[in-house]
Each structure stands twice: as C-alpha cells, then as structure tokens.
C-alpha cells in the first residue's frame, strides 16, 4: 500500500467510525470496518514514521453528543485489541509475556457503561465516550432494573460493564417500531446504545436492558487477581454469566473459545467474541498500555454473522398459498462458514420501508438456521447505478395476473406449478407427515415427471414410478415407499397441520384434534371461535377451508389411518387449571416443561397477564419476568417448579 492509498483509507475509516459512533448510522458492517482497520495496522507496522495522527488506530472513537452533559471518568475506559485466530492470540500472549493463568468471559455485543458508586450509592452512569469523557446518562441508568442502586461497599469505585438487549426483546422492539413506521434498529447493540441515550427515561425503562460487569476503574480494592475482583463485584449484586472461567494456559483458552462459540446461538444475547485477559493484576500493571489498548487483554473475535455485500437482483417465489415473496440475489459472501447468495425481503412493503434498490450495498445477517436477512441499506454509498425494484403484475411461474392486496401480492391460479409443488413439500415435511426421504428436490423431480401431481397422489406411488429416475435404486425406492406407508399411520394433528390451512399451525391443529377428533372439519364457526386461543380470523379461515375441501378430507380419511393423541390429565394436583408462562433458559427444552404442565392439567400461555398463575423463569429471563413482578404474579425458578410438581 502506498502512502496516498493509506491516507485515503484513514479518511474512509474515520468516516465510517463517525457514522457508527456519533450518529448510530453505520455505513459498513463490523467485518468490513475490522478488515479496514487491520489494513491500516499492517501499513503502520511497516511504516512507523508515516503513521497519521488521524488514524483510528491512534485514538478511541468519540461518542459525545450535545443532548447530554459530559462527564469525566475517574480512570480512562480503554477499548480492546482484537485477535481473530489462534496465531494472532498466541502472538498477543507473547507480547504480553504471559502464557498461563488467563481469565476469560463472553464478549457481549452491547454498549459499554461506567457506573460510579460513593458511600455505597450509585451516583452517576456514563457512556464510554472517547475513553476520558463520556455522556452523563445517569437518569437512564436508574431505569435499568438489574443495576444495584445501593451496594455493600462504601469506598469510591467505578464498575464497568456492557449493557445488552436480549434477542427476544430486540425483536419485540423492532416489531413495535415497524408498526409506528419508525426506522428499525440494525442489531441489538445499536438498540442498546440507542436505548441508553434517550431523553425520555420511560423509553429506556421499557426496553428491559441488562447490565453485565466486566471490570473496574477507580477503586481501592486490595485483590491480586482480576478473577477475585470480579467475584467481589458479582457478590455486590451484579449479574454473572454462566461462562466465566480461569484457563491455565492458551490451549485451555482455545478449548473454551470453541465451547463458547458453540453456545453462540443458545445465548439469549448477542456475543461477538471472548474476552481473554491476564489474571495477575501485578503483571497487568507491569505490562501497561499502548496508545489505545491495555497490553494485558484482548478480544478473541468470533466469525462475523453480519457482512456487507451488494444486492444484484430479485427473484420472485410463489408459496403454497399463492403469496409472492421477493428474494434478494446477493454477491456471494461467507457468513460463519456458509456461503450466502440470497436473503429474504419478506414482501414489497418491506422493500419500500428499507428503500432498497438493485446494486445497493446492504448488510446481511445470518443467525443459526434462520434465513439470511437484510438489516440495513447503505444509501450513502450509492453510485448512481441503482435500479428500483418494481411490483410484479404477472406470476413468475404461470404468468397469470396477480392480485395486489398491498402488503401481499398473490397468484390466484390454483393450478400454478409452484403453488402445487410447495404444498406437497409442506405436506411431507418433518412437522407434518414427516415422510423420510421425500425432500424438496425429490418432490420437484417427481412432479416434473408427473409421478405426483396432488397431495393424494403421494399414496398411490408404486415401485415402477421410480424406475429410470436419476438416483433411484431398489433400496432407495423401497425405503421411500415404506416411509410413505408409515405416514398413513400419522397423528391427526400432523395431518391437519399438513393441509396448510391459513392461520392454523401445529398448536392450533393439536387443539382441534383434542377437541373434536376426526370430526374437526365438520364444526360451526361458533365452535371454532370458542376454542381457547382461537379467534374470529382463525374460525373464518377454518370455515372457508372446510367448506371447500370437505369431500377431499373424506377421501384422505380413506387413504390414511389417523391416530388421535389423547392427553391423560391429572385433575387432582396443585397445577390443575393453573396458567403458566415460561421464560428464560432452562436446563431442558421448554417443550418438556410444557408437556408436563399440560399432563398435570395446567396450561401454558405465551404472554403474562393478571390471569397468569405462575411464571417459570430460567437464566436471562426477559421482559415477561419483569411484567410478572409488576402484576404480582408468582414467579418460580426451576427448583421451585420441581418441588411444585412433586406435590
């Protein structure tokens, strides 16, 4: 890299940094920004005499805004050096002159906060700011429920940590903002930062923020280990994450990293890495600091789940109900080991809300098995080559005229090939008839060769239907035919789910099965509407579907031997007739607790109200627990629940 190119990249990095930290309006993904900073560092290490004083590597990002007073930290708040792989970790440890006794914990992706306590009372809270001076957000800090306002330590002390928003709460916040036509937060970190810097403290309160301490600033503690400091801080009443440990050497650090990375999707809040620091405080003092980082700690970053790429086109997909779904075609990008080439755009209202165009740079996020989605459009990076995404008039599959209902655009042709194929794929899927071996590609192949053309035709398949088809040999054919035969004996609720009735999912199908048995499709509007959890919309959908398809369901009954699940309910226990809400992370899947509660005659609701009898909560319980406490609903942990069900 030449000096001129280096200075251009310094200017670009500063532009991205100001947009991110000062305006909460990022112009690039974290991965893009990190890569740019690493390029600058490589040049600076090789050209120490040409380092620009304006380089972001030489300063802490400013976040001071005019709406809040400035407040000086008693001791500087440092950022951390990033390392991205084993070789970089070992290089950092070598520079730190330490290869044993490391303290490690998750690096939560939130907003840093500095709390000052005097005489055991919380007196102020401030953002990191430029490291020396932050924003005074004390009034908002007092609205964060899990921050102790009084502690059993009378000396002056700064306690530092990360403010996060749980993933579930983040989704609810964005759902609410969408209804109000407000811009959506790109990620939970931006939401946490924005929530802390509200002029209206009631908004901060309703966001259900969580604070996790990771260190101290000014203090008079006499501990010799950082682990001892953190144990003391948590004993004062602060939250502690389950994954905090001491590692004897770097091999243990690497093992812990792999373990934590495997927990990434299960954690209720976002993590972007693992903090690794020297545990010996005397050695930390000896090592000191660079111009920007402590030498005794580093952030061992996870692979990015969010990256920037370009939207190069839009494909239209036709669902089994005829709804047209636009899918973004992307320049391929590697997200956590998976090459992502497309992302959902949901519907054309979402396209309008995002104001996304073909050739835009966009930020794409992938989480677990969730379909990748676009979280942000970088409009400031437009080059004049962008093209509008127009609403379709004709079905991309059958070319029939589409019905435009505003949010939804539908193909009304019931013989549309994509509608039929997707209906069959849904019918045989795991949560429906669960026909092993009859996956999406096989369904498409069989439909293409006219071996299956309706849902019913699946059960008329014979051995010779598969002969000559690519990939089908005797064993595979017999296995598939056996799986189809086994599916004839499926539970009634699975069959109802498989029919793909609008608004009727697995839970509603179970309710219909248990309430009406095989006569479920012969009921009145009132009978449907009176079912718990059902409403007018679901009842209307059922009435319309069963009116049109009653004869067809009768024919299915001749093909299938459907089983009705019977729930044996214990009616004399303390749980009988009680309503539970489950929240947080428990030792076993929620479905197991739900099944036990229902077996004992209780029921499980998805929301807390005055009619709720118990809230069963686990680790990182969210807003449901807070609401339960406000309504004075009895809250029990897993241990108390186990005692309750023993009675």
UniProtKB/Swiss-Prot annotation:
Listed GO biological process terms: DNA repair; DNA replication
Pfam families: BRCT, DNA_ligase_aden, DNA_ligase_OB
Superkingdom classification of source: Bacteria
Annotated binding of Zn(2+), by residue: 395, 398, 411, 416
Catalytic activities: NAD(+) + (deoxyribonucleotide)n-3'-hydroxyl + 5'-phospho-(deoxyribonucleotide)m = (deoxyribonucleotide)n+m + AMP + beta-nicotinamide D-nucleotide
Keywords associated with the record: DNA damage, DNA repair, DNA replication, Ligase, Magnesium, Manganese, Metal-binding, NAD, Zinc
Annotated Gene3D superfamilies: 5' to 3' exonuclease, C-terminal subdomain, BRCT domain, DNA ligase/mRNA capping enzyme, Helix hairpin bin, Nucleic acid-binding proteins
Residues holding NAD(+): 30-34, 79-80, 105, 128, 162, 301
E.C. number(s) listed in UniProt: 6.5.1.2
Protein name: DNA ligase
Organism, as annotated: Campylobacter jejuni subsp. jejuni serotype O:2 (strain ATCC 700819 / NCTC 11168)
Native organism taxonomy: Bacteria, Pseudomonadati, Campylobacterota, Epsilonproteobacteria, Campylobacterales
Name of the gene encoding the protein in the UniProt record: ligA
């Amino acid at each position: 890299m030449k000096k001129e190119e280096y200075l251009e990249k310094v200017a670009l990095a500063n532009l991205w940094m100001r947009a991110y930290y000062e305006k909460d309006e990022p112009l690039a993904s974290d991965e893009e920004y990190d890569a740019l900073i690493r390029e600058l560092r490589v040049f600076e290490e090789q050209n120490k005499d040409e380092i620009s004083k304006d380089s972001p590597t030489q300063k802490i990002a400013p976040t001071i805004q005019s709406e809040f007073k400035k407040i000086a930290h008693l001791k500087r708040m440092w950022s951390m050096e990033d390392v991205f792989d084993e070789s970089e970790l070992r290089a950092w440890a070598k520079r730190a002159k330490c290869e044993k006794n490391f303290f490690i914990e998750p690096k939560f992706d939130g907003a840093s906060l500095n709390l000052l306590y005097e005489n055991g009372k919380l007196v102020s809270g401030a953002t990191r700011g430029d490291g020396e001076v932050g924003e005074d957000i004390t009034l908002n800090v007092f609205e964060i429920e899990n921050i102790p306002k009084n502690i059993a330590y009378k000396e002056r002390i700064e306690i530092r940590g990360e403010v996060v928003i749980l993933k579930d709460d983040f989704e609810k916040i964005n759902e609410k903002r969408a209804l109000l036509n407000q811009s959506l937060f790109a990620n939970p970190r931006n939401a946490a930062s924005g929530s802390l810097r509200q002029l209206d403290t009631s908004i901060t309160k309703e966001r259900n923020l969580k604070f996790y301490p990771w260190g101290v600033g000014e203090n008079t503690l006499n501990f010799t280990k950082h682990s001892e400091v953190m144990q003391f801080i948590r004993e004062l009443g602060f939250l502690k994450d389950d994954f905090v440990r001491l590692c004897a050497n770097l091999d243990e650090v690497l093992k812990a990293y792999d373990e934590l990375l495997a927990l990434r999707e299960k954690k209720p809040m976002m993590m972007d890495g693992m903090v690794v620091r020297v545990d010996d405080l005397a050695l930390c003092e000896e090592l000191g600091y660079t111009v920007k980082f402590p030498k005794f700690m580093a952030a061992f970053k996870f692979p990015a789940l969010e990256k920037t790429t370009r939207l190069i086109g839009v494909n239209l997909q036709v669902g089994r109900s005829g709804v047209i779904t636009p899918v973004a075609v992307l320049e391929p990008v590697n997200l956590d080991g998976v090459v992502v080439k497309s992302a959902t755009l949901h519907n054309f209202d979402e396209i309008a809300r995002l104001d996304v165009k073909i050739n835009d740079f966009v930020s794409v996020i992938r989480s677990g098995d969730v379909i990748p989605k676009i979280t942000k459009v970088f409009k400031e990076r437009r080059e004049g080559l962008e093209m509008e995404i127009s609403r379709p008039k004709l079905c991309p599959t059958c070319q029939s005229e589409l019905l435009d209902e505003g949010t939804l655009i539908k193909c009304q042709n019931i013989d549309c090939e994509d509608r039929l194929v997707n209906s069959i794929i849904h019918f045989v899927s795991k949560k429906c008839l669960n026909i092993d071996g009859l996956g999406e590609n096989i369904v498409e192949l069989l439909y293409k060769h006219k071996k299956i053309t309706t849902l019913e035709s699946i059960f008329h398949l014979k051995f010779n239907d598969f002969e000559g088809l690519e990939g089908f040999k005797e064993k595979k054919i017999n296995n598939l035919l056996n799986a189809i035969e086994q599916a004839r004996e499926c539970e009634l609720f699975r069959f109802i789910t498989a029919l793909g009735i609008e608004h009727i999912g697995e839970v509603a199908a179970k309710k219909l099965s248990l309430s009406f048995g095989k006569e479920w499709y012969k009921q009145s509007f009132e009978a449907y509407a009176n079912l718990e959890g059902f409403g007018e919309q679901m009842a209307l959908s059922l009435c319309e579907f069963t009116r049109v398809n009653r004869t067809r369901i009768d024919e299915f009954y001749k093909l299938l031997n459907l089983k009705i699940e019977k729930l044996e309910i214990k009616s004399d226990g303390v749980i009988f007739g009680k309503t539970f809400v489950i929240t947080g992370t428990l030792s076993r899947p929620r479905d197991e607790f739900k099944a036990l509660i229902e077996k004992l005659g209780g029921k499980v609701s998805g929301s807390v109200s005055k009619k709720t009898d118990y809230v069963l909560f686990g680790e990182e319980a969210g807003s449901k627990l807070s609401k339960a406490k406000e309504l004075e609903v009895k809250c029990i942990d897993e241990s108390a629940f186990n005692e309750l069900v023993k009675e």
